[in-house]
Amino acid sequence: SVAGLLKAHKDHGSLPLPELLKPSIELAREGFEVSYDFNYVLEWGKESMLMNETSKKKFYDQSLEPVKVKSILKQPLLSKTIEKIAMNGKEAFYEGEIAKWIADESLSNGGFITIQDMSSYEAKYRKPLATSYRGYKIVTMGPAASGGLVLLQTLNIMENFDLKESGHNSAETIHILSEAMQRAFA
């Protein structure tokens, strides 16, 4: 989250915020070359992405095809948003026009985020969760978010299988991963 980034910067950062965010501002303004993977994800998620007018306009052409591989995707509004955050901090994002736009987009698309939710949001430090997986220490986010716990449970289940033998992206490996995730989410 923006609040998390700004809290980490305030507590641990050494660069001035505008200098820290300058590469992101420039990348959004100047654009980046669309990769095969990015194009694939847009095609894969097309049905849900097209339900949102903003996403539809930004990531799809008039024939509803995703932005082309090797084309340059510029995001001037994102650049301006990051510039405002660089100059005015948390308030630039969680109060005023940006917060109103996010809340309006959420509510008009069936979401639940309100302007009050935006203005009252705060980042919090939480104790991370950790496990070992095949000799590596894996550290991830702790509760209240559930994603970190599910990740660690999935890895702990998968450690019981020889994934090298079944092969990268093989039907067997994907089956093992699917079953492990299903049990971790249960």
Q: What is each of the regions a protein language model found here?
A:
Residues 1-186:
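Feature marks proteins synthesized as precursors that undergo proteolytic processing into two chains
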